[in-house]
Amino acid sequence: MKNLSFLINRRKENTSDSNVYPGKAKSHEPSWIEMDDQTKKDGLDIVHVEFSPDTRAPSDSNKVITEIFDATEDAKEADESERGMPLATALNTYPKAAAWSLLVSTTLIMEGYDTAILGAFYALPIFQRKFGSQNDKTGEWEISASWQIGLTLCYMAGEIVGLQLTGPSVDLVGNRYTLIIALFFLAAFTFILYFCNSLGMIAVGQALCGMPWGCFQCLTVSYASEICPLALRYYLTTYSNLCWLFGQLFAAGIMKNSQKKYADSELGYKLPFALQWILPVPLALGIFFAPESPWWLVKKGRFDEARRSLRRTLSGKGPEKEILVTLEVDKIKVTIDKEKRLTSKEGSYSDCFEDKINRRRTRITCLCWAGQATCGSILIGYSTYFYEKAGVSTEMSFTFSIIQYCLGICATFLSWWASKYFGRYDLYAFGLAFQTIVFFIIGGLGCSSTHGSKMGSGSLLMAVAFFYNLGIAPVVFCLVSEMPSSRLRTKTIILARNTYNVVSIICSVLILYQLNSKKWNWGAKSGFFWGVLCFCTLIWAVVDLPETAGKTFVEINELFKLGVSARKFKSTKVDPFVVKTPLKTSLITTPREISKLPLQRNSNVSHHL
């Protein structure tokens, strides 16, 4: 935090100033602060300060005004400091916050793992013979398209239910305990998958496991965005994508081993299910000791607990650390208080659509996450099955999948470097543009039946995975945490993720019909379809997706309130803490300047929080 010594001195000055009037009466001290009814109705951020003869003790009146103005000034200082904080300083100041965020996000490894093994099972010989049927034309064993669709629908339906349960659970017990409960249920539901003897049991197990996965999808992103400063926000929210990839890579390695050693044994599919018991217990213990989100605590009015939570995320000791805590709590208070004027007291799902501002924020968040499905990423999840249907051998299909996930991990790390030079929108849009081109090439190669074209289409799907994990895949986790207001963040993310799940269900059904030999049997020619859909997603991003890189939450709030267009978000500068007065035409940016005004009896000062 910059200028800590200055802030310490200012605090001391404020303390001494409060004792200037030990017993003397001031005739024109501010006696109350009010917001008129029309201002409240219009949702304007204007606080009306009336100056009139004070009937209360002068020192009490002065203290009230000083506290209100100091809170706003503290919020401004915290916001400016966060915006200008270098990455190295952020890591040095918030190392514990980064560590706690990484721990919570690790829960997504399990979702990435299980969803990947489900798609890989369709290419596993023992699974095909145990639960599938033989194709009369080709003689091959495979899981019917209807069952593939059913299993996919089950876990996605479970995720939708889990996401909806997450909202009230977080409101009731907070982020930490909600995650711990979800981990407990995941460990319990895994028994159903391990002891499965029919596709029906797998369907039930997938549906039940989907509920805790839905919880992980929402809370990992919101927790990372709320516990860390702006300089770390991109890295720690996009780490969620890395966790997905780690889980998928782990699954690909396990499935390749199963294909080699347990191709004719039930351990080929039981062992991958059993490995899901590794993480829940250690993760639950770690999350139990993690600090709660200070934003959630402030929303609940638990300010002392919010301060304790912030102390646990900061390094160092002494007055500097306490000032950091005070400034951050004041900033959170001011941000939430501003949002309360536009929404209901508690914040409900209906608030996400109540007014034009929140409707826009909700729409962008939902479509942004849905873009992860419409860009063709679901095809990457069925990569092993795709490679096999494109004519690649089963063993080579599993090898391609491992290479694909390794490329995805490298691409996500590369996106961290690229984020220093390009914005969120840039990475999102450029990634879609490259994916569109590659998908059309894959479709063209699918029109040929030569061995070279089959290997080429498989190789290019790895290129799609690379560009996807360089652009849209990681940046979405950051964008969906920045677009909603702080009071509605969890609920908006839940709506957005459920939008993604619904769109993913549709895309998964289409993919399974496109690849299954008993249905459309498109094979690599399906690249044409996903190229067109990816291009449509790109057009939406150009028109509607704002650039939020380098913007703090309070700045983003102000830009949305002003109705700034998507392409002007980056260049528009706002000061959410500016103070205006009708006595002067200039803008007053600190409460300290208010004391210098030649205030007269019954004069007004409008303070723009």
Curated annotation (Swiss-Prot):
| Induction section of the entry | By maltose and maltotriose. Repressed by glucose.
What residue ranges are annotated as transmembrane?
107-127, 143-163, 179-199, 201-221, 235-255, 271-291, 364-384, 398-418, 427-447, 460-480, 493-513, 526-546
Q: Where does this one sit in the cell? A: Cell membrane
Give a GO biological-process term.
Answer: carbohydrate transport
Taxonomy, superkingdom? Eukaryota
- What's in the keyword line of the UniProt record? Cell membrane, Maltose metabolism, Membrane, Sugar transport, Transmembrane, Transmembrane helix, Transport
What GO MF terms are annotated? alpha-glucoside transmembrane transporter activity; carbohydrate:proton symporter activity; maltose transmembrane transporter activity
Query: Which regions of this chain are Cytoplasmic-facing, per the record's topological domains?
Result: 1-106, 164-178, 222-234, 292-363, 419-426, 481-492, 547-609
Which GO cellular component terms are attached? cell periphery; membrane; plasma membrane
Question: Secretion signal: which residues?
Answer: none
InterPro entries listed in its UniProt record: MFS_dom, MFS_sugar_transport-like, MFS_Sugar_Transporters, MFS_trans_sf, Sugar/inositol_transpt, Sugar_transporter_CS
Q: How does it sit in the membrane?
A: Multi-pass membrane protein
Extracellular compartment segments: 128-142, 200, 256-270, 385-397, 448-459, 514-525
Query: Which PANTHER family does UniProt cross-reference here?
Result: ALPHA-GLUCOSIDES PERMEASE MPH2-RELATED, PLASTIDIC GLUCOSE TRANSPORTER 4
Known function: High-affinity uptake of maltose and maltotriose. Also transports alpha-methylglucoside, glucose and turanose but not melezitose or trehalose.
Family designation: Belongs to the major facilitator superfamily. Sugar transporter (TC 2.A.1.1) family.
The protein's name is Alpha-glucosides permease MPH2
- Report the source organism: Saccharomyces cerevisiae (strain ATCC 204508 / S288c) (Baker's yeast)
Which lineage is the organism of this entry classified under, starting from the top rank?
Answer: Eukaryota, Fungi, Dikarya, Ascomycota, Saccharomycotina
